[in-house]
Curated annotation (Swiss-Prot):
Belongs to the TraB family. Disulfide bonds: none annotated. Involved in F pilus assembly. Residues 417-426 have a biased composition (Basic and acidic residues). This is Protein TraB. It comes from Escherichia coli (strain K12). The gene is traB. Residues 444-466 have a biased composition (Polar residues).
């Protein structure tokens, strides 16, 4: 059997010969066509069109499919530019509206300040109390002993305070001989065995999730960075193989919303389907590094290729060579059995066959070869049963990852905080609401049920005036 190097060398020589023959044919044809044009009747040769610049075109033919693709790209670019223009226009409208509101608010504040300044000037000229009444004069003091003058009749001088207005008093001392009105206070009596209410206020300082929610059905363009040979056997979905892709486009969400997840990695698992000749790929987790935040969480989704679920491939069976060896071993087994039977001498009815040394040697060779070939054939069959069909999927394929179930993007820190909070709630279950101690002390340590049980053992006749116990006491 020729080595792989010899086979490759022959192929290279074959291709070299094909290239040389093709080049020579092209040169000869060009020379022939040039001679035919020069031997013409002097007709003017039409000016040939310049060779189109095919730089950037992937395919060798510029057909309708490429033109349609270019048109689609231009339409998508125009739609994106129109969307950005509309967003900028809305932002400018909002800013103009806010500017007008701020201007009106400033004017209103200026008017309020002017009105307050006028009120302050009016209060400085005529001070009044909080109820709008003028400030009362101080009452006259009672006459002192031995005819001393009353302090209230003596003029009192105060130092000048400048233009500072004196604030009105908030309360007045009651006059002589006036009794202040009584004050009534109310105090609630706690009732036992009642449900207590507790109001929980929302923590306004707590912020919501810092990352968006990806709704179900969202999708993004991606590229496979790790291929695999998907197991296409009957139990292939139980023995999946890992794969990985890199998101290369924006995540398209409902209502033309997008999220930039470019560069994120998505872990995959795949198995093969012989009927459709496709590798069925499912997502496992997503990992990103966005603005210094680490995202690593499980997700549910699948991968599609050219509009269909799964990635197209060719089913490969690698047990053909082993099956050929098993067939060869079976063939040798048949030859050995034939040699063994041919070496047996044929005798008539009732006669006894005599075996010679040559017959024994032939039977041994045929039987040994048959047994060895049969064992080798069984071994190759068992080896072939271990092989299963696979669907090879190479890296570099452009695919689309689809998120089947919606999920909330969370950082590693947020997920750790949630686990800590859930663990704390499990360790500290909510306890029942206790009865306040003031209620027991107010009812001498008994609640309503206990008091009814104690009173149920009393006889009401003991508290009547004509009872027997009362007559005995009178004696």
């Amino acid at each position: 059997m020729a080595s792989i190097n010899t086979i490759v060398k022959r192929k290279q020589y074959l291709w070299l010969g094909i290239v040389v023959v093709g080049t020579a044919s092209a040169i000869g044809g060009a020379l022939y066509l040039s001679d035919v044009d020069m031997s013409g009747n002097g007709e003017t040769v039409a000016e040939q069109e310049p060779v189109p610049d095919m730089t950037g075109v992937v395919d060798t033919t510029f057909d309708d499919k490429v033109r349609q693709h270019a048109t689609t790209e231009m339409q998508v670019t125009a739609a994106q530019m129109q969307k950005q223009y509309e967003e900028i226009r809305r932002e400018l409208d909002v800013l103009n509206k806010q500017r007008g509101d701020d201007q009106r608010r400033i004017e209103k504040l200026g008017q309020d300040n002017a009105a307050l300044a006028e009120q302050v000037k009016a209060l400085g000229a005529n001070p009044v109390t909080a109820t709008g009444e003028p400030v009362p004069q101080m009452p006259a003091s009672p006459p002192g002993p031995e005819g001393e003058p009353q302090p209230g009749n003596t003029p009192v001088s105060f130092p000048p305070q400048g233009s500072v207005a004196v604030p009105p008093p908030t309360a007045f001392y009651p006059g002589n001989g006036v009794t202040p009105p009584p004050q009534v206070t109310y105090q609630s009596v706690p009732v036992p065995n009642r449900i207590q209410r507790k109001v929980f206020t929302r923590n306004e300082g707590k912020q919501g999730p810092s990352l968006p929610y990806i709704p179900s059905g969202s999708f993004a363009k991606a590229m496979l960075i790790e291929g695999a040979d998907a197991n296409a056997s009957v139990t292939g979905n139980e023995s999946t193989v890992p794969m990985q892709l890199r998101i290369t486009g924006l995540v398209e969400m409902p209502n033309s919303k997008t999220y930039d997840a470019t560069g994120c990695f998505v872990g995959l698992e795949a198995w093969g389907d012989v009927s459709s000749e496709r590798a069925i790929v499912r997502t496992r987790n997503i990992s990103c590094l966005k603005d210094g935040k680490t995202i690593d969480m499980p997700i549910k989704g699948h991968v599609s290729f050219r509009g269909k679920n799964g990635i197209k491939g060719e089913v490969v069976m690698r047990n053909g060579k082993i099956l050929g060896w098993a067939w060869g071993a079976g063939f040798v087994d048949g030859i050995g059995q034939g040699m063994e039977r041919a070496s047996q001498p044929a005798v008539g009815l009732g006669a006894t066959a005599a075996y010679g040394a040559g017959d024994v040697l032939k039977m041994g060779i045929g039987g040994g070869a048959s047994k060895a070939a049969q064992t080798l054939s069984d071994y190759y069959i068992k080896r072939a049963e271990q092989y299963h069909p696979v669907i090879p999927i190479g890296a570099g394929n452009e695919v689309t990852v689809v998120f089947q179930d919606g999920f909330q993007l969370k950082t590693v820190e947020e997920m750790a905080l949630e686990r800590t909070q859930s663990r704390a709630e499990e360790d500290n279950p909510e306890s029942p609401v206790p009865v306040p101690p003031s209620a027991e002390s107010h009812l001498n340590g008994f609640n309503t049920d206990q008091m009814l049980k104690q009173l149920g053992n009393l006889n009401p006749q003991q508290f009547m005036s004509g009872s027997q116990g009362g007559g005995n006491d009178g004696k």
